[in-house]
């Protein structure tokens, strides 16, 4: 039946927030009952989005919206025509026809009142307060509701924090998303959680600041742009040159940086955009340079030639934490970037080195046989008697004749492993590197930066890719008769987390941060009670923190990239230097803030000498600038008003996967350069997986774009996104297959509020979230329920309603007292959960109050008060209006941090209290706090009895009647005592209303025999209910139910009697427990008696029926 809302005419019937929606059916929604997108689903695009569309696309969109609007108007007119026909039919049936003339006037008036235009929001100029329709739309439309509010919030400076405010500060910095394309669902989770926190704190009286920023993402961005240039122009970055390539990256940043910020706005993120930053903007670059110079001057940054993790695809060093290891048990073929055929791993290859002077040979084994081209020694254990005769001898390299000293090293060599002889390649193995330093061996690098054999590897192999050289070396060894075979070997293989390339240890000069001291300080503030200034949520990550920082190594911060912060170091080449290569002399480096400063410092360092300065071409690790983020976003190194007011920040919210990448480095840098721990609490959110628990991957096609969930997208639209991306054509095919399987019908429009609420409610799922889009769809349907609840309230409140200045719950009807009491409890529980960072519990508490208490119970319970103008309910009606308004107004404020758009729109529609200046927006209202005189445990206890009774009545109805039957039935309540009897009698109206009963007769034990044709259900030990369904009773089914009940009672009785019959029972069991057991047994026997009589009653009814 349609919902009719007339301005002056009385509503015929209103049905909303039906209690028939069960918990399970709501939480497991199906796509079949999704709302069809109508004109209300269209929206006005933001200016930033318009820039992305062409004029032709805008014109097409405009025509589409106009067409949709015409369709909606026609639909509304058709509904109005149908409604008038129903009205006339009802009047004819009821004999309430009015004279034709009068009816004609009335129908014209009603038709004008239901003008479809009244249900459509007028267009709102960008940045102005949203202009709402005079009548609420018949259905919730996320696109319509979410339109216009954000631009108004932003233009009104509602997100802006004041550095001069006297309010206590609360500060969060947004983990800056990479400028590599669009936001993903993980960013949406971050935004949903952080915006929930910041809106809650803002409403709780804090000077709340949430700082936005975008990260330049050195390696990630360079990889993306390199792929784009290769795809578009067939060129590498080396082909286009550094200067041109960097220009291309800036173009990419300017294009996609705006997209990311637009998406954050669509997510409702209440970020202070006046403080927006980019990690390579002028102020952040100044901070990076200052940090590098200060740390260098203090001796914490230094340059050294060390073995590094080298990525041959990226041609750069990467840090230890960017290496992912896989365990290989035996011979395994793996796909390696840049190689057509899979490469063998998990083999231990043995070969012989001939000894100088014809003394024989030594056999060595390796998993990387190609590295023998760079061998410079063979190590044995000094105490190994087998090789005593080889001390001080040499082996000869079979390919180049190089003499390899046989050295004794008791640290590296295990005489009981293999042959007891170990080949040493100092330039390409961490352990061998240490041996090379101990024995002053030659370090021979055999690889080019892109992973090919260089001239040091010999002319027969030079130019070969390293894994092709592996095969060639084995063949060459076989030809010389030196190959001794290969066998399976367990090993750990290091892969780059970004490119999946096999890491090659390479000897390179790099810049490092000495982390020993600052790492210890960062550890102490999290684990020592006397210095504890940092807390992790969940607490389990404290152990992870300890593990990382107790084993911390110096941080390699230089990268051989073109995109990023150039290292502020210059090399001075002196005129007198014999070696002119940059970096040849380690003491010729000068670190300074500018080139002029460097020149001045070099002039002082090399007094009277001529020199040329060359800036280091390398850039800094992205995490270096990110590690300064809490400092740099507030103006550091300058002592700004923001820095004084807002540093240190309050909370860091991020994913646990970057605990060491980012969190540890921020703590180390913040303490060293800012003087304090940069935040006092770190909340680690779970990592999002797909519904099957798989990691989201573009190549699998299971990556979810938050905008596609908000706006909805067809399967074809999902495919199009893949085609426009950077995936290899083969990967596109696989990804499309994954999309067909996961999203056969695309993704329905869910809206921002539903997506946010779903993501926050998922946070209780340990360290991983298995995101099911159907759950988001369910919360979108719930938004429709909230919408209908307010529509119902607006009609019942009426145009002239004025909310009360004060409220006295004790004078209100029972259901009103109850809804305020449970609301009070929900408020307290929500605040406690938010304080504890238990966001899922907070969301579920709010959801449960709205869904199961306000909509399912309270709205249904007060409907009799509004059924006509019955003077009997005049007082109750007024009280119900007040409780309805206060519940809605408070409930919307409680929900707002989680669902900002729908709560703002619904709150703005509520009438304001008279003579009270209303806040402009719900987001700057006070967050609800518990009110002492609202709590009423007695009322809640009695309502528990009422609802338990209703539940039993509904169960009886469901078991006895077909689902489509909804007639009111007579019922009886059999009470064991006066207290129960009084409760049921006092709340007869609520029970009859909620259980849809025609009557409810309350009787005490022994006063009433159950009527024929009735079925019984036990509410509790003191209350049983009967539902009378004439002719619908299945006596055999009823008897089976009673037999099962008697069987359960028999088990309870036997268990209790067995315990009470123990010989020592009377002596050893305390008197109070014996008394309790005796009472339990008495009640069981009483129940026995009752159900035996019920069985006899049903048998008699069956017999009488048969006799008739």
UniProtKB/Swiss-Prot annotation:
Q: Where is the transit peptide?
A: 1-46
Q: Name one Pfam family in it.
A: tRNA-synt_1
Disulfide feature: none
Tell me which UniProt keywords the record has, alphabetically: Aminoacyl-tRNA synthetase, ATP-binding, Coiled coil, Cytoplasm, Developmental protein, Ligase, Mitochondrion, Nucleotide-binding, Protein biosynthesis, Transit peptide
Q: Per its UniProt entry, what is the enzyme's top EC class, as one word? A: ligase
What's its catalytic activity? tRNA(Val) + L-valine + ATP = L-valyl-tRNA(Val) + AMP + diphosphate
Q: What is its EC number?
A: 6.1.1.9
- Which CDD domains did the record assign? Anticodon_Ia_Val, ValRS_core
- One MF term in GO for this entry? ATP binding
Q: Annotated region Disordered: where?
A: 57-138
Q: Which residues form a coiled coil?
A: 1032-1064
Similarity-based family = Belongs to the class-I aminoacyl-tRNA synthetase family.
- HAMAP family in the cross-refs: Val_tRNA_synth_type1
Designated name of the protein: Valine--tRNA ligase, mitochondrial 1
The organism named in the record is Arabidopsis thaliana (Mouse-ear cress)
User: What is the name of the gene encoding this protein?
Assistant: TWN2
